[in-house]
Amino acid sequence: MFIKRITILAVLILEISVVSANRLSLGAEATYSPTLLTVGDSTSLLSDAGISLSISYETERLRYSSFFSFDKGWEHHSFHRFSRLNEISSMAFSSSIGYLIKENLSLNADIGLKLISVGVQPNNIRVLSPFIGVILRKEFFSKENTPNFALFVPIEYTFGKTAKGVSLGIGVGCFFSLPKGEIR
């Protein structure tokens, strides 16, 4: 039921964006984030690498975005004798709103849900956890109707009952923007 509501929300965001956007963007991003994560009674320091697909629409000062991402984590150090986090991956759906601080530089607030998988199938454990984040994003535009690029610094906090963590990362993205007249 919850997944159905999220899907309906994503479709509504897409429909609203087509009608009201000054600019609609489709993008792909890659991130690397050192992460301190606790799942159950296991706490580890991880390197987390991820890829995401996004759709965004913008007004004069604001950007609204939806993301679907997949991440893979590698354990560097466990704070327990026996670690369960040496095999970990996650999928996430999130939405963000960004405010244009100055030309091509924006501050974004992110909220979403993350499905964390720990261990090797078929004995893996899956945990659904909410997260919030802040993203500082700098965009670099090329010619109109060509791919553009962005650098960004995400800070993320996961706060579920079973899974808790914090990460600070760096990322790069490629996005393609369509002027409003070309959306239809």
Predicted regions and their residues:
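Short, exposed beta-strand-loop hairpins at the edges of beta-sheets
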Residues: 160-162
